[in-house]
Amino acid sequence: MLSVKRLNLDSSWHIKFDSGNFIIDPWLIGSEIDGFKWLNQQWHIKEPVKVENLPSYDFLLISQNYEDHCHINTLKEISEDKPILATEKAFKKLRKEFPKRNITLLNDNKEIKYNDLTFITFRPDKVLDPIYYAVVIINKNNEAIFYAPHGFVLNDSQLSMIKKFSVSLLITTFT
């Protein structure tokens, strides 16, 4: 069973995928700043779900290190009992901010099993591009969610890795 609920008009989601029940990229409080406040600060156009009103969930998935995905002020308001799975750059940021929290690193191009789901993280090939990760979330029936909130171009190796799965849901931007 797959259930998807949008938590804001950016990239925060609540996903139920078989036995997996998790929140992706929660930015639910205040503004987000990319770089310098005077250069690029963004606010929600529509009020997001309040932290205290989040649906039940077992863990968090943080896909990017950017503040609209890895929002420290929101994460400070979420119970530290909730484990976090994070891509490499987000993991480094989170480990500095929350040294005692249960945070699992999702290594690039490796299958990581967690709560009856498998996670594969892809990073782009181009060295000069910003690092925008994609995460594939697979259930025990080889059905998958492909989450690439900034878009993503698969290389041949990554494409061959996901060909064995049936992608049921694509969450991405189309800009």
Give the ranges of each region predicted by the language model:
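Active-site-proximal loop/helix segments of hydrolase catalytic cores
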Residues: 125-175
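Active-site-proximal beta-strand elements of phosphoester/diester hydrolases
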Residues: 3-6, 22-25, 118-125, 144-151
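Metallo-beta-lactamase
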Residues: 86-142
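N-terminal pre-catalytic "stem/leader" segment of glycosyltransferase-like enzymes
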Residues: 1-16
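Active-site environment of divalent metal-dependent phosphoester hydrolases
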Residues: 9-11, 31, 65-70, 91-94, ...
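Active-site neighborhood of phospho(di)ester-bond hydrolases with catalytic His/Asp-centered motifs
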Residues: 24-25, 57-70, 85-88, 146-151, ...
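Pre-active-site segment of Zn-dependent metallo-hydrolases
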Residues: 20-61, 73-74, 153-164
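Active-site HxH/HxHxD metal-binding segment of metal-dependent hydrolases
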Residues: 46-110
